[in-house]
């Protein structure tokens, strides 16, 4: 059986009626090419089914057009949304994303990182599990490849980082509750080993102190991201502290579980803090990585830092690095937006 002829750049040039160098300029996105010529070349590429050899392009032009992305856990909504935002933004710039899984504990991170560098990517984004950031940065510097970290907390120094402002988000939620009349506000969720939780609890505590409200350590409860455990935890919390009128929840899962727990206990969730004790109502507030339009219609006030927007910011930052618009490291902190309960 005859083998299909491989379409070359010469075939594209002949079909478009231009020189090979013109086709090369269109493929690389460099040089001054008229719109009409570019459209003619791209039409020929599509008609012939020409597949660009990115490795050869890298040798000719110094860039592959590929950005590596190592994700800690693709099953987590945060990283899935971040990946979607990053990919969409980079593809709009004519780039492709090479996606790899680094492991929840970063056990495969170094091996995956080396693989991307050896593949000749233009840059690498690492989302989560960045404990060995110094080693990775040195490896990237040796090959003059930019690396940017996407983090949920501020534990990285002297590297390019894009992360949410956890303290500001906690301050937004807590102050909103206080201004709605709440004075007895508890915290539910997260593990003490989590840096993200530490920053959020710090913002919560700082806001209580700012308004002269007491901090009760026994009102700050750990809880895994389980609706069942959250429901049980809030039920026990309110049984021992019935005058608590509001609870700040670590994430969407905790908030949903807390809401179910309130319903099961015969209590209600709402917004205002006035006369909450007598009405047996409790206001819920929580952090979310989702976009406002995807939030469930339950009575919860949200501090939203959409992971998809973090991905878009990462893409913009990476383009600045690989086009040399900006070379020094930056820590980009994305503020949260408040979405009041309906």
Curated annotation (Swiss-Prot):
A GO molecular function held by the record: DNA-binding transcription factor activity
Superkingdom of this protein's organism: Bacteria
Residues covered by the HTH lacI-type domain: 7-61
Entry keyword annotation includes Transcription: yes
Primary role: Repressor for the malX and malY genes. Also regulates its own expression. Binds maltose as an inducer.
CDD domains (alphabetical): HTH_LacI, PBP1_MalI-like
Protein name, as recorded: Maltose regulon regulatory protein MalI
Origin species: Escherichia coli (strain K12)
A GO CC term attached to the entry: protein-DNA complex
One Pfam family matching this protein: LacI
Annotated DNA-binding residue span(s): 9-28
GO biological process: negative regulation of DNA-templated transcription; regulation of DNA-templated transcription
Protein keywords: DNA-binding, Repressor, Transcription, Transcription regulation
